[in-house]
């Protein structure tokens, strides 16, 4: 929502967007989010019921939005679950649930979106990966492996979209202090949702391929990739 808020604020100055579609589960509960967007400058805000795990319905949801609102300019794909690593190590069903939401469902919606935006000849896609997928750690390897898959898929999709008029921005945040990580001790180089949103909007404006949040994580993980495996294995999250 922080990204949408900034895009709405830009729209109020004539430099952004006026119409926003919030696609989410329990979309009827998004009164506060809709009011926030309108206050920021959005002219039209619509809510659409969307269950990311219901991959069979992805195409229908997107077609309905496009048919009613016309070409899509910016699509921010922002859903996922952290899961419980300890449970996932014992419960294959839970592990598969994390993989399905964080990877499989993304492959589905991004494939449909890529085809839709290609047909338009323009548009921007925002995909949220994570540094957890840059090098997967013992502490959260189920979630990390899903993010690693998503990162690779999005990177390849961005290359496939080159020359089509469609731009894909891949965002790699570190630990984000927010609802998903509530109750957890922040990791080094943590960021807030506002900081992630600022970096994302700047990346869209500059048509960047990849944005690390915070930027220092890029050189940090360049080194992390080279650590010997026995050392890496002992690192905390």
Identify the role of each PLM range.
Residues 135-141:
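Active-site loop immediately N-terminal to the catalytic Tyr-X3-Lys motif
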């Amino acid at each position: 929502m922080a990204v949408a808020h900034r895009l709405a604020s830009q729209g109020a100055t004539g430099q952004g967007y006026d119409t926003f579609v919030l696609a989410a589960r329990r979309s009827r509960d998004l009164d506060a989010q809709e009011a926030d967007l309108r206050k920021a400058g959005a002219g039209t805000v619509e809510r659409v019921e969307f269950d990311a795990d219901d991959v069979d319905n992805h195409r229908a949801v997107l077609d309905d939005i496009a048919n009613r609102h016309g070409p899509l300019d910016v699509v921010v794909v922002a859903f996922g679950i952290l899961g419980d690593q300890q449970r996932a190590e014992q419960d294959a069903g839970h592990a598969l649930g994390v993989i399905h939401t964080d990877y499989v469902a993304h492959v589905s919606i991004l494939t449909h979106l890529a085809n839709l935006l290609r047909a338009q000849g323009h548009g921007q896609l925002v995909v949220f990966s994570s540094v957890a997928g840059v090098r997967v750690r013992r502490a959260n390897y189920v979630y990390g492996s899903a993010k690693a898959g998503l990162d690779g898929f999005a990177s390849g999709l961005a290359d496939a979209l080159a020359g089509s008029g469609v731009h894909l921005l891949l965002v790699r945040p570190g630990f984000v202090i927010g609802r998903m990580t509530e109750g957890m001790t922040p990791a080094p180089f943590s960021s807030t949702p506002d900081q992630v949103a600022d970096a994302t909007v700047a990346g869209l404006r500059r048509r960047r391929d990849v944005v690390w949040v915070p930027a220092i994580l890029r050189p940090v993980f360049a080194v992390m990739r080279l650590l010997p495996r026995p050392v890496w294995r002992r690192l905390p999250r």
